[in-house]
Amino acid sequence: RRNDILCIFTRAVTSVERQTALEQEARGRHGEPAPQVCIAGTPGVEFLEPRPRETDLIVTKQRYSIFPGTGLAGWLKARGRDTLIFSGLTTECCVQSSAWDAFERDFHVFIAQDAVAAYETDLHFGALKALEASGAILAPAADFVSVWK
């Protein structure tokens, strides 16, 4: 933040009613109930540590990626931002979807590989491998911080 690094916090906020037929069908195939982690009005949509500060941008999304329906790409481009460093959950879902969408929108993509995680180790490392093969640069979060000092 001291070095003009914009911090963007994202959260998925949805409802069982807003799930698409495709999402409902996919979960049904696996015998899974509707997820309760991102339902509006529940603790699942609240930020844990680190929490956003007043100067940070908060983007609320309804999809895995941070881009569809948020206007974020245009907002960033209008401010001359062309590089994104991703951290967060989950590596194989929201992080990977957002990173690939960032590539499609001509952003440079970096992944703080020790600041992303998945529920399953093989999915985590598989997603990192796929992202790196697609052109993302992976590095520990400390490497990014040291560049900004």
Residue ranges with predicted function:
Residues R2-N3, S15-A21, E25-K149:
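Active-site-adjacent betaalpha module
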